[in-house]
Every structure is written in structure tokens, then in C-alpha cells.
């Protein structure tokens, strides 16, 4: 009931004890933009100033009249909940005033593309204090600047995003806002967790659909297509990242996205694919056989090793734990398993770990934050050490497997959502390069090369850190449940 100021409850379906409730008030599902703005201001540690954010503009491809697919800037979305192009936003910290600016009405654009948001529609839809048209933006900022005191700053993310017309004496700060927003985004609120959970729900449906049909498929492209079809059919139009559907040796390529090779003669598929829901990501990886069971003992053994790595790490997730310690644990388990298989040799587990030899087979980090980005931001990277200025996600840089001291690494906090994604890979390139490195004496290359047809195994879930431990938000089948679905698919 629009504008009623209360939530009307409609019982839309009753099935035994399953009662699904729909809340019809607009306020119930509004993105908590105002709460986020206050959180960012608290991280800034100031009592006055103006935050100014620029949304994603409409942009054409180079040398083309065709627009690029729209993707909202995530920092802008965090303070607005607006997934529309060509918008702006200000937040007056002292007066606690969040203002959204929407595009001016353009008749030509409306005829061709449909009308843009009106002020009234935006005010009803979004959790902001006021909505104005873009034409008001310059004058509003000039008025704020005219009233500001000498200690107030205008906060922007990047120097390239400053307003066009400002008094020369107004001080700009393009350094403080980004880390403040990163710190705020690292801890998810209830609304954000619901979005990530829903993204995982749709992803699980798509992963299950692939398992049900994989034995009737001929190419990696069919796997990608069915995953996309299932997500879109269930309301998730966008993927959080490019789908990785690598079969055979392609499964050893961490970010393989060509997805254009035949499945025939391949043992395993590594499917790393996650839907996006209302701009929030899921990140899910499953590795499965192209048969009703594991095609070889080697494939089974590597899957079970990665399964053990993941289970042992997930069970230890709770607030106060250093994620880097879990990454070291994953390497220890990997080394022990690879020694049992005769792939690693000639030293103790600790000697091999300190040498870095295990990174040939487990070359990426154990995980990363998930949120508005699949590799989401936070106050500090999960595996960062004191003095480490590396910005990128831990999955994109070499793993710290033999770090001498982990005490400066950040601790897990309640409200964080992190992936746990161990993997074991047998890459021809990595093995060839390892022969030239100092730890080559620990690797039985003849034995390792027998595993190259497997490619690699990765298993990845999204884990919420809770007050009492953790919750696995990912429900995509794995292990024996996964195999049973593949087997049932033969008869369907």
C-alpha cells in the first residue's frame, strides 16, 4: 500500500506449513542507502563535509553508436541503491542530508529509450532524503560551498570526478573517501546478506541444472549457455563475473573464459560461475566428472583432497580468526595429500611449505571478500601483511604460503562474507617452469605429469562470518550429492 507508512502482509501461498509472506510496503525492501551514508561518515571520522559521488554515465563503444552494457559504479550504488545511468549524489554530513540527482527529462531520449526516473518515482523508490533533477546540482553545490566553514571538505573518490564549478578556496579531499567506503563495505548488513544469499540461491539452481544435463552435452559452450539461461529465467540477468567452464586441461587455467572446446575425451569440468542479484555477487565453483562417477582414481583422489582442504578451512571460520592462517592450513593439507600421492617428496611438510613448492599446484589465495564486487573491497585485503600495499584481491596474486609472520594479517569480523576456494591444478606451463626453480627437488615431475589430463579441481563456497561462527550461503551441490544428480540425469 503505497504511502501508507506501514507494511501490509499478504499470504500469497500456503503449502502445508510453508507460508510465504509478501511485504507490499515500499519501505520494507528499500536499499539502506542512508544507513550506509552514515556508516561511511563514521569511517571518515568527521562531523561536517560533503560527499560527492558520480554514477555510471551512458557510454558508447569506441567508434560506435552502440552503448556499452550498463553497470553501475559500485561505490555510487552503496550510497544510493540506484541502478540507473547518469545519476549523481551528495551527502551533507553535518545536516545528515542525502540527495539524489536524476537526469533531466529528455523527450528524444524518452521516445527512443523510454523515460528516465522522475523525481517522484525516485523519492518513492530509494532511501534518500530528497531527489532533484540534474539541472539543480551545480547550484546546490555552490550554495553548500558558500555556507561551508574552513574545516569542511568536499570528499570525492577520484580527482577526475570533482564537480565542474567550485570556489577556488574550497578544499577537496580525494584520498579519504575511498578507504572509508572500503572499510564500510567490508562488513555486510542484513539487506546485503539477503542479496548475496539470493544470488547464491539462483546460482545453485543453475549449477544443479548443469549437473542434471551435463552427460547430454558436447561442448563447454553448452554448459555456459545452460547456466546463463537458468539464471536469467530466475530473474538474475547479470553474472557477477565471466563464466569459467573449463574441461580437461582447461580446468588448470584459473580464469579460462573461452568456453569453446568439445567435452569429448575430457575427465572433469571446473565450472566457476555465480549470478548477481540486485548488484550483489555470488562466487561459486564446482568441479565434476563427465561421467556417472570419477573416471579415474587420480581424479577422485584430487577431488577428495581439495574437498578436505575446503572442509577443514570452513569449519574454522569465525570472528577473530586470521584468514591467512587458514590459507597456510590449506597448503599444509595440500602438501600432506600430494606427498601421499607421491607428487611431492624429499622433505618434511614444513620444509616443502617454506620452499613454496606447493604454489605450483595451489597458486592462488584461499579466498576474498564478496559483495557488490565479486572480489569485494574491505579495510584490508584478507591475506595482507603490515606494509603490504597490494590492492588486488588475494585470488589474483601469488599465495603467501611460507610467510614468516602472520600477526599483522587482518582478523575475520562478524558480517564479513568471504569465499573459501582451495584448488589443486596440474598445469603444463607451471610444471615446466617449476623445473627451473629452487624447490624443484621437492616435486616428482614424472608423477605430477600423469595428472595433467585432470586439469584441476577447485571447490568454492561463500561463507558469512556470524556472531557464533559461520553460515555457508552456498547451496550448490557438491561431493556425493553432486554425483547422484549426474547419475539421475542419465535416466531423465
From Swiss-Prot:
Protease is among the record's keywords: yes
Highest rank taxon of the organism: Eukaryota
Cofactor annotation comment: Binds 2 manganese ions per subunit.
UniProt cofactor(s): Mn(2+)
Amino-acid positions noted as binding Mn(2+) 2 in the UniProt annotation, renumbered to this chain: 272, 283, 460
InterPro entries in alphabetical order: Aminopep_P_N, Creatin/AminoP/Spt16_N, Creatinase/aminopeptidase-like, Pept_M24, Peptidase_M24B_aminopep-P_CS, X-Pro_dipept-like
One Pfam assignment: AMP_N
Function text: Catalyzes the removal of a penultimate prolyl residue from the N-termini of peptides.
Name under which the protein is recorded: Probable Xaa-Pro aminopeptidase NFIA_010500
Higher taxonomy: Eukaryota, Fungi, Dikarya, Ascomycota, Pezizomycotina
